[in-house]
Design a protein with these regions (language model features):
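Strand-loop-strand
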Residues: 1-188
Length: 188
């Protein structure tokens, strides 16, 4: 059995143009990880994921668990985010008609438990063929990595929506994520 005390291996460096520090501990026995408690902290991380999204964020996370159960907790503060991916309505409609494959048994495994807060105080922008808008969000992400659940609120502060050759001015809008069992937002 090997146990690394909390201050044994602090790591710090640069990741995605920002500063990343990782502290924590891990225990190994029989060549396997038996428990861990790791705290990554990122400041000014510039990400280009998923496709069409550029963001600058700060994060304080905690990853901990053992062979039976794992957790990912913490806070992500979005300093800037821009979504530019073009949206093809025809492809989406045709894609919706295809039958969805049933998940295999490995996809039904739980995965780590989530307890995350994502804060974006007026720092989210969308600029693509469907909309130009500014938004803010305060969201909680819970559930598991295989079945995440989002609760909270996202507010559209201003913008324009482009549909069938017309431009619609958005004065305000909101998405309320109130269903703790599935992603089912209410639009206002």
């Amino acid at each position: 059995t090997v146990t690394l005390p909390p201050a044994a291996l602090p790591l710090s460096g640069t990741l995605a143009g920002g500063r990343l520090t990782i502290e924590g501990q891990a225990a190994y026995s029989g060549g396997r990880l038996t428990s861990y408690d790791v705290r990554p902290t990122g400041r000014g991380l510039a990400l280009r994921y998923p496709e069409g999204v550029r963001s600058l964020l700060d994060a304080q996370l905690r990853l901990f668990g053992d062979a039976e159960k794992q957790w990912i907790t913490g806070t992500v503060d979005v300093r800037q985010a821009l979504y530019t991916k073009r949206y093809d309505v025809a492809s989406e409609l045709l894609g919706a008609r295809r039958a969805l494959p049933l998940p295999d048994s490995t996809a039904l495994e739980e995965g780590p438990q989530l307890d995350l807060r994502v804060r974006a105080p007026g720092t989210v922008r969308i600029d693509n063929n469907l909309a130009t808008l500014a938004a803010s969000a305060d969201l909680a992400i819970q559930g598991t990595t295989r079945a995440p659940v989002v609760t909270g609120r996202a507010e559209i502060e201003r913008g324009r929506l482009y549909f069938q050759g017309r431009t619609y001015v958005i004065q305000r809008g909101a998405l309320d994520f109130v269903n703790p069992r599935r992603l089912d937002p209410l639009f206002d």
